[in-house]
Amino acid sequence: MAVKIRLKRMGAKKSPFYRIVVADSRSPRDGRFIETVGTYNPLAKPAEVKIDEELALKWLQTGAKPSDTVRNLFSKEGIMEKFHNAKQSK
């Protein structure tokens, strides 16, 4: 099972917000998911990002691949740097 960390679209038409979820890569974008890692609201000024850092690192170490957008969000929050440092120290 290929696991990805990606965005699940929520909210009304023309006013989206997203949940950052861990899901099987074969499941639909807004379909079945394994676990919620955080939220992302691009409409707030500045954009609002809330991520459970421990959960995100756990899934990254398990082998889940983040989507491009999630990778950028994780980088801005410093999670990718912590993941790479933990990987290098082993």
From Swiss-Prot:
Pfam families assigned: Ribosomal_S16
Keyword Transport: no
UniProt-listed GO biological process terms: translation
Keywords annotated in UniProt: Ribonucleoprotein, Ribosomal protein
Signal peptide: none
Gene Ontology terms for molecular function: structural constituent of ribosome
Family designation: Belongs to the bacterial ribosomal protein bS16 family.
GO cellular component, one term: small ribosomal subunit
Database matches in InterPro entries: Ribosomal_bS16, Ribosomal_bS16_CS, Ribosomal_bS16_dom_sf
Superkingdom assignment: Bacteria
TM stretches of this protein: none
Annotated protein name in UniProt: Small ribosomal subunit protein bS16
Source species: Bacillus licheniformis (strain ATCC 14580 / DSM 13 / JCM 2505 / CCUG 7422 / NBRC 12200 / NCIMB 9375 / NCTC 10341 / NRRL NRS-1264 / Gibson 46)
